[in-house]
Amino acid sequence: MENDKGQLVELYVPRKCSATNRIIKAKDHGSVQINIAQVDENGHAVPGEYITYALSGYVRARGEADDSMNRLAQKDGLLKNVWSYSR
């Protein structure tokens, strides 16, 4: 929620799992948030430019985190031609 000045006043802002679109609960201690930096042509990270993925504990517990990361990275153009079992 925002106040009349436009500042965020919530103590907890829920996240959504990037793989399943489920809301990650506050007590989900198995969830992770991964930032992947954008790089320039020299291979150096560009400050302030990154892509954020949040994975819930449910996805990680099922062993689907690596496949989900590959799928999301392919969709965002970070990876090309990664083999997937679901194809």
Swiss-Prot record:
Keywords, alphabetical: Cytoplasm, Ribonucleoprotein, Ribosomal protein, rRNA processing
Gene Ontology terms for molecular function: structural constituent of ribosome
GO cellular component: cytosolic small ribosomal subunit
Pfam family for this entry, one: Ribosomal_S21e
InterPro entries the UniProt entry points to: Ribosomal_eS21 (IPR001931), Ribosomal_eS21_CS (IPR018279), Ribosomal_eS21_sf (IPR038579)
Main location: cytoplasm
Protein location: Cytoplasm
Keyword Ribonucleoprotein recorded: yes
GO biological process per UniProt: endonucleolytic cleavage in ITS1 to separate SSU-rRNA from 5.8S rRNA and LSU-rRNA from tricistronic rRNA transcript (SSU-rRNA, 5.8S rRNA, LSU-rRNA); endonucleolytic cleavage to generate mature 3'-end of SSU-rRNA from (SSU-rRNA, 5.8S rRNA, LSU-rRNA); translation
Function: Required for the processing of the 20S rRNA-precursor to mature 18S rRNA in a late step of the maturation of 40S ribosomal subunits. Has a physiological role leading to 18S rRNA stability.
Family recorded in the similarity comment: Belongs to the eukaryotic ribosomal protein eS21 family.
Subunit structure: Component of the small ribosomal subunit. Mature ribosomes consist of a small (40S) and a large (60S) subunit. The 40S subunit contains about 33 different proteins and 1 molecule of RNA (18S). The 60S subunit contains about 49 different proteins and 3 molecules of RNA (25S, 5.8S and 5S).
Protein name (record): Small ribosomal subunit protein eS21
Gene this protein is translated from: RPS21
